Each structure stands twice: as C-alpha cells, then as structure tokens.
C-alpha cells in the first residue's frame, strides 16, 4: 500500500519545477513524421498540412488523414527512424535531469512507435520510454498501412489536437512549482500558454515573437540546461516567490523555486 504524502512532501513538490518537452524537431533534429510523409506518403499530405497550418482542422484530423496516405512497411519505417539524428546535447540534458531530480515529461503530437524507437537508440529507459512520462499518439503498422489513434485527445480541447498538451500539463503541474516548456513547432503553440518559462526554436520561436509570448531561444539541449539553470538561479536569488516570466505571468501566476 502506498504511503500517504505528508504536508512537507507536498510543500517540497510545489517548489520543484516541472519540465515538459516536445519530441519531433526538439529532441530529434528533424521532424520524424514529416520525414515519413516526405518519403512514403502521397503528395496530397501537403494539402492536409496546409489546412492544419491555417487552423482549418486540428492536428488529430490532420494526422489521421496524412497517415492514411502512407505506403510503407515496418522495415522501411524503422530504417528511416533509425537514421534521424538526436539533438547532440540531449545526453547531457538527461544526465542533468537525473542529477537534479526534476520531473520530466514528453508531450508529443508524434507517435509512440517512433519515439520509443529513437529513445531506445539514445539509451533511454524507464518511465520516459516505457511508462507514464510519455504522452503521444499511437501508430500501428499493418502490412504497408499506417493507422493512427489518439489516446491523449481530450473532450476539453478546443483545437482538435491529437495530443492535448495543455490538458496534460495542467493536470500534472497542479502540485509543482514553475512549469518549463521546450518546443520547436506549431503543435506547441497551445502548450506555451500553460508554461512559466518557455524555450523555443524554429516555428515556435517565430510564433512566440509574433504573439508577444515571452520565450528564450535555444539551438541544442546544451542551451536548454544552461537556460533552465539560469532561470531557477535567478528565481532563487529573488525574495520570496519568483514572478513567472512566461505566458502564465500574464495571468498573475506566482511561483516559487526555493
């Protein structure tokens, strides 16, 4: 039987930051889903992508329609996935996470099939690869057909997302301190509203700048480690709670990292 959480443990947990991270184009250097579509899908996938980019459809409908256009065997997909490079700073980031003891979750509009294979190659095990620290869509390969399903969609979602990142983040961050989000693409644009500290690159960086969302640019996970440490150190140096610098600051959220 699991022991009850004490008040002191709850207080400590509220002070501890929680980190959420995208996968495709963030942990990997390329968007794996886009690579699959480029290589093996009927060209009509680009028209579907445009519908999603302009907001006409959500990512669930987008991915469902796009993956139905893929013609590839499991062996072909695996070979493509195995060739996708991982961010060179990611191993250091994982070591830093282990040393710091901070909770870390991958929230992705990509596919568990892909993510688990890449993480295995990167030497990642445990909850991040096999357990409840990974939230993504499901992909089944049947002959040359790829069938997508969406276990992390939500009835609360207003945007038709395949993986509703804001709902997941709100649920998991209730008893934690500052919320950190790391991402690169348009599928992250709704997630940043739930973060106190945003690290962004590529399309997400452009979106944040256009929308006036406070963020810190990054290139690799070496930058991510340094930026998060800087954010936490500056928070600790303040008196009492530290004002959040990300989107949640505009809602008056107050956080503490002491």
Predicted regions and their residues:
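Alpha-helical substrate-recognition element adjacent to the catalytic core
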Residues: 2-123, 131-138
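C-terminal cap/substrate-recognition subdomain and adjoining C-terminal extension
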Residues: 2, 89-103, 110-258
